[in-house]
């Protein structure tokens, strides 16, 4: 008994993410199945292993998402220097067209997250490059019709009720973002390709360096060359292409990608329709989640005192978005860990990783919620000097705290769903919970019962809570041995280019 415990402890001291095949894949599984160790000893040792994996993956992922949001924020700041009209146009372009494109492309890119993660865990390294290329092809094709939305942005905005002068200026900004569509189409498959191999730190360095370049180029565009709003949006697109090219160079020269990138392959053109179906399910799952909070703001604009409601909700949504960045990092970590362990044939490790990641994210979100409630009367003064808005934010703080706690669990479970390949199922759950339950209840409470923003938010919290409970139950009842079998069968079918979805 003592020798097995000593071996388990010694295993913890080995380099975690650069181990040999057997060490990296079966270390935690061997600990969890070691009957010579007591139950609590197994949990303790496995937790140490998982925490190392978790924070190695989550911390850089959080940093990357924060930096990428920082680029959009800098663009809006420089647009504000051009004038209030330009700021409104840039905000409209970013929150409308850019966020729609970002959500769609990021969602479709998560399909490669499932396949690359499971293939890497199963040591089918040659297929990772094929999945990367296949996803890129699908996303580039998807980007072509989206380009038409950007080209005809002016009449589209006018038809949606925007003033003609705002629509005209916004369309100029949107034109400069067209290259960004295809930067997204290449970037997100690359990002998931690297994450599935636990290669996350290089992307963080690249994003940080690009943020500095973006700042310099934006300043030159506005103050040195006078290129105006179009110049700012072109710089934003260029910054994303810098990220893409830097990651491509890294893949080409890094020894860590030699097994997974063999160059371009004609296999990438096989099974594109089935790959598109999986990508579309992933996109629907993510878009339904990201659009949900936007609908809360839209409904608030229909209230009797929309200005106060929108101001207070904007502050709450900004705080929620900052907190959500942490959850997104754990979402990425959960997806990678679960898909890797399923691909490697480790059902207990996949289940344990799910429990640890969810628990850590929940505890962090609970701490954030307590801080929000403690500072609810003063936190709004970071954004505004208005006492009326501060009071409204204080009234909404309990709803914000509940949302933050739910966001500590729900994105992690969505990451587990991506790791398992459940995107289509979660998309149906999202439709039912968010759009059939949450929004109608919020509308009735907010308008029929005159509860205002609190009523709308109560209904939408109800939808999120229902979705979270369903995902918790589904995850808790998961037969992880069967998920390992499904992962193996999925990889066999994709490698043979037979339909993935006919399982």
Curated annotation (Swiss-Prot):
Record-level GO cellular component terms: membrane
Record's bilayer topology term: Multi-pass membrane protein
GO molecular function annotation: antiporter activity; xenobiotic transmembrane transporter activity
Spans through the membrane: 54-74, 87-107, 137-157, 166-186, 203-223, 225-245, 271-293, 313-333, 355-375, 399-419, 427-447, 456-476
Transmembrane helix listed as a keyword: yes
Keywords: Membrane, Transmembrane, Transmembrane helix, Transport
CDD domains: MATE_eukaryotic (cd13132)
Localization: Membrane
Superkingdom: Eukaryota
Keyword Heme: no
InterPro entries (alphabetical): MATE_euk, MATE_fam
GO biological process terms, semicolon-separated: xenobiotic detoxification by transmembrane export across the plasma membrane
UniProt record similarity statement: Belongs to the multi antimicrobial extrusion (MATE) (TC 2.A.66.1) family.
Protein name: Protein DETOXIFICATION 36
Gene behind the chain: DTX36
